[in-house]
Amino acid sequence: MTMEALQFLLAAPPGAYDPVARTIEDEPRPSQPPTSALALDIRGLRKSFGDNDVLRGIDLHIPAGQFVTIVGRSGCGKSTLLRLIAGLETPTAGHIVFGEDKLPGDVRVMFQEPRLLPWARVLANVEVGLGTERNSPDARARADAALIEVGLDDKRGEWPAVLSGGQKQRVALARALVSRPRVLAFDEPLGALDALTRIAMQRLLEQVWQAQGFTAILVTHDVAEAVALADRVLVIEDGRIAKDLPIDLPRPRQRGSAELAALEGEILRDLLKGAEDTFEL
């Protein structure tokens, strides 16, 4: 794709050249109420692996329903923080308290790799996200509703092998959404996608977040993605929060706008300064 074509797409109204958005608008919406999101309070959070202190004392409050993005250089601790929030790791010190009693399935994670079962069709892969409720009478209807939300209900009977990379990630998103999580954590889920598919997926993530109302926490290396999606951007440096920047811009946001570019520049300057301090450039 030429730079001119990409700029044309970025300047277009949301959905104008977005096959995902068009599919979702054309399909009937599942008649499900918004999710009751969870707030998070993180106090004195530390994580070490042997002698390596990855997180060095994180204090953070995330209100229910907020969309938070986390950026930082490789090895700064951002993915470790996400895994601690998701309960995939145990902290060395400190604690994470959710706003209400958290139940199994309230927190879900979507990774960069879709991790689909190759021997199961799309609908069955989505049903996996229901966990112990997979055998409930409404399991198939709930999985169908999740596929409609991501614009893939016409692929319910396909095998994962025939899907594109973007379609596989949309199935993974449906699998995460099907249990109606109250917190959804994203660990660089769009990192392996091409530019156009990535933009379409960013818009889809924003749409399902607005529709379901869960608390969203996204780890990404892409500063433009972080600013476009977030209510708030956290910069992690050397295991600590180096910057906590609110993004007070109306939605939907215009990619390539001067306001977004200014915020991206501010965050990039902080990241580059941290790199210079670390490597003494």
From Swiss-Prot:
It is a peripheral membrane protein. The keyword Translocase applies. GO terms for cellular component: plasma membrane. ATP binds at G72, R73, S74, G75, C76, G77, K78, S79. PROSITE patterns: ABC_TRANSPORTER_1 (PS00211), ABC_TRANSPORTER_2 (PS50893), SSUB (PS51291). Belongs to the ABC transporter superfamily. Aliphatic sulfonates importer (TC 3.A.1.17.2) family. It is found in: Cell inner membrane. This is Aliphatic sulfonates import ATP-binding protein SsuB. It holds the Pfam family ABC_tran. Residues 40-263 form the ABC transporter domain. The lineage of its organism: Bacteria, Pseudomonadati, Pseudomonadota, Alphaproteobacteria, Hyphomicrobiales. Its EC number is 7.6.2.14. The complex is composed of two ATP-binding proteins (SsuB), two transmembrane proteins (SsuC) and a solute-binding protein (SsuA). InterPro entries: AAA+_ATPase, ABC_transporter-like_ATP-bd, ABC_transporter-like_CS, ABC_transporter_ATP-bind, P-loop_NTPase. GO terms for molecular function: ATP binding; ATP hydrolysis activity. Part of the ABC transporter complex SsuABC involved in aliphatic sulfonates import. Responsible for energy coupling to the transport system. Keywords: ATP-binding, Cell inner membrane, Cell membrane, Membrane, Nucleotide-binding, Translocase, Transport. It catalyses: ATP + H2O + aliphatic sulfonate-[sulfonate-binding protein]Side 1 = ADP + phosphate + aliphatic sulfonateSide 2 + [sulfonate-binding protein]Side 1.
